[in-house]
Amino acid sequence: MPPETLAYLQTLIGSLDGNARLYQTALTHRSVIGNTALSHHNESNQRLEFLGDAVLGLLISHFLFQNFPASAEGDLSKTRAKIVNSKSLACFARSIGLGEHLLLGESAAHYNIRDSESALADAFESLIGAIYLDKGLDAAYGFVDKHIIHHQSFSAIVASEQNYKSCLIEYSQAHHVAAPVYTVIAEHGAEHDKEFTVEVSCNNIKGCGTARRKKDAEQLAAKEAMERIIALQPLPHEPKDEENSTTT
């Protein structure tokens, strides 16, 4: 593994615990296999991508199940699909500079596969699979929490599949707090061409929205509040210190 890639991985996920080869496989594109110049690499990241896809699906399903208790199965499935599709995963991969460290065959490098949506998405899932094998589910949770749940685009992805006002009601019910309160705080324009600015408050979290109809302004306010709530939510999992809990 190139020294710069080793340093990159150690910065990204911590100690590799003697499993550098596992992570190297996670970064190995299938174009490498059969490449005589890289004959020492005999496995691509496709198997790890298969595993990482399943682990990621579980973690995102857990997050959505816990945070949207009133959402129907179909709505949760649509939201999960949008989070884990290739476009979204490639975005998350680019944000951590993953493409710069992909190991590619000569032909793939020539066609700029390094920045392709599918290659980045596959490598991102492969890395999650490697983390799971090396460090366990808690570490995989931590990686997903940091690089997906708290990514700047995550709240917008989730909100795009939700009715924002309904989401706020679900949140208030799940956390046993008062229902959201909507207040018109400003009106602008002539009587026939007004714009309304609405503020919503829920559990001391506020959001604002402006639109020509109060109903639309309320939705925009709820969207902003939900984005702030999601940004503050950790994954609903507390790592267990099994060593400390075991008596000797």
From Swiss-Prot:
Residues 163-231 form the DRBM domain. The active site is at residues 53, 125. GO terms for cellular component: cytoplasm. It holds the Pfam family Ribonucleas_3_3. InterPro entries: dsRBD_dom (IPR014720), RNase_III (IPR011907), RNase_III_dom (IPR000999), RNase_III_sf (IPR036389). It catalyses: Endonucleolytic cleavage to 5'-phosphomonoester. Its EC number is 3.1.26.3. Keywords: Cytoplasm, Endonuclease, Hydrolase, Magnesium, Metal-binding, mRNA processing, Nuclease, RNA-binding, rRNA processing, rRNA-binding, tRNA processing. It is found in: Cytoplasm. Gene3D superfamilies: 3.30.160.20, Ribonuclease III domain. It comes from the Bacteria. GO terms for molecular function: double-stranded RNA binding; metal ion binding; ribonuclease III activity; rRNA binding. One of its GO terms (biological process) is rRNA processing. Mg(2+) binds at residues 49, 122, 125. Residues 6-136 form the RNase III domain. Its main location: cytoplasm. Its cofactor is Mg(2+). Belongs to the ribonuclease III family. HAMAP family: RNase_III. Digests double-stranded RNA. Involved in the processing of primary rRNA transcript to yield the immediate precursors to the large and small rRNAs (23S and 16S). Processes some mRNAs, and tRNAs when they are encoded in the rRNA operon. Processes pre-crRNA and tracrRNA of type II CRISPR loci if present in the organism. Homodimer. This is Ribonuclease 3. It comes from Chlorobium chlorochromatii (strain CaD3).
